[in-house]
């Protein structure tokens, strides 16, 4: 069975409490359950992780280069600032990476409109709330 790493960045551990008007009321644990169910239906193993620390995300991306068939990543605010995450994803190419955001980053503050991850991802899904994770897994499964 192929494994997909589902990586989550800063503040996503606070889902369900943090700005539910923007991010919804679903917790990250519930999203993890959704991903595991979607993965099972797609024949994929899911390794679901979250960290508030950029270096952890870089380490996990590099680990995925050796252990995973693809990555779904919600880098949170690091999407807009992290050259380190961009470079880590570039270093594991051609491993497919799908970027996910719960909110539509293009309909929010202008500083959120630019993603450092998008140029090295196979695609981005944003604005569909937690469903975006399932959509990203379906898209990756179609590529694997």
Swiss-Prot record:
Enzyme class: lyase
Organism taxonomic ancestry: Bacteria, Pseudomonadati, Pseudomonadota, Alphaproteobacteria, Hyphomicrobiales
Protein name, per record: 3-dehydroquinate dehydratase
Source superkingdom: Bacteria
Organism this protein belongs to: Mesorhizobium japonicum (strain LMG 29417 / CECT 9101 / MAFF 303099)
Metabolic or biological pathway, per its Swiss-Prot or TrEMBL entry: Metabolic intermediate biosynthesis; chorismate biosynthesis; chorismate from D-erythrose 4-phosphate and phosphoenolpyruvate: step 3/7
Record's keyword terms, sorted: Amino-acid biosynthesis, Aromatic amino acid biosynthesis, Lyase
PROSITE patterns recorded: DEHYDROQUINASE_II
GO molecular function: 3-dehydroquinate dehydratase activity
Stated role: Catalyzes a trans-dehydration via an enolate intermediate.
Site (described: Transition state stabilizer): 18
Subunit structure: Homododecamer.
Pfam families with a match to the protein in the record: DHquinase_II
Family statement: Belongs to the type-II 3-dehydroquinase family.
EC number of the protein: 4.2.1.10
Annotated residues for binding of substrate: 74, 80, 87, 102-103, 112
Record-linked InterPro entries: DHquinase_II, DHquinase_II_CS, DHquinase_II_sf
GO biological process: amino acid biosynthetic process; aromatic amino acid family biosynthetic process; chorismate biosynthetic process; quinate catabolic process
Catalytic-site annotation from UniProt: 23 (proton acceptor), 101 (proton donor)
Keyword Lyase included in the entry's annotation: yes
Reactions this protein catalyses: 3-dehydroquinate = 3-dehydroshikimate + H2O
